[in-house]
């Protein structure tokens, strides 16, 4: 098992910051609340609980040791983040969202996770199970908040930009104001962007990040300018201009980010009407 990472408190208690899911899974298994399935090699264990193992095998399992990296309570968030990244350098590299979840635990990231579980939001953002399990919903939520506040300050690399935003919000953030911003955006998208919402087409199982950023932040900026906005249609989603702005090429370019976000804003506000379509 990979190293576990924990923080040592004032009374030497350990709080796991990386590996809690592994520990919980082991506890569930040893308590007979988890049944093995989907094993490709040890197929004879499929459908079996811990108590189904021979006594000798159970004892050997329980005697296996764990390896811990212990971080003192004096370590700064930056040090914790650095340690977390260093111990997660296996071939199955953590996503930026997974790293952030372990490195920046606190009220703000708890809020990001809370928003990511919103049923309306998940309905608007189709996603594969593997993406869901690797923190993609949290990634999208964080991008919405970070870009809606600071897209004009974005330079190039998204990951460090988001990390900096999280660290700033860990110190102070207006939870209710941000929750309202997120909820209002989702409600608007659900009402006016059906049936595709953030996907390219109905029944898609993918939510492209560049498309999500453009629509979500563009909606927020348009509503900020006109809270009573009721667009006639969103046909511009099918325009050549929008498709060009939401391709993945140069997606991390600050000029492209600004362009696609403000394009959506201006289309919603009726400031862009002379657009080109495939049949033009």
Summary of predicted features, one role per range:
Residues 1-163, 243-254, 258, 269, ...:
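Basic- and aromatic-enriched surface patches that contact anionic nucleotides/nucleic acids
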Residues 29, 147-151, 168-171, 191, ...:
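Amphipathic alpha-helical interaction surfaces
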Residues 156-197, 201-204:
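Small-residue-rich helix-loop
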Residues 196-243:
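C-terminal hydrophobic structural anchor segments
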